[in-house]
């Protein structure tokens, strides 16, 4: 079997973030074990997301972030804000024909909402 990409996100409360991210990206909670919560895309086309409990809160900017790609950036931002995400910048960034909004999840992990196919 070829290697597959899996993502691990450190967090203080993996159960809380599991609710946010499962609704945000349409994943399903597949299991819990100790300090971990596993989220999966039921189609199997997207990488698994493992939420790992850590004792220290997030400090500083992420070295890597998620892009949520959508044809309707403003509507997606509003939906994610209703789930508990917040904008980091009041206005969208527009550059080289691309448009995105920088946001944070309920624990402050940065991610972007961007035009479909125009990841930033």
Give the label of every model feature segment:
Residues 12-20:
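Hydrophobic ligand-binding cavity/cleft-lining segments
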Residues 16, 46, 75:
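Short alpha-helical
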Residues 2-12, 23, 31, 37-40, 56-80, 99-104, ...:
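Vicinal oxygen chelate
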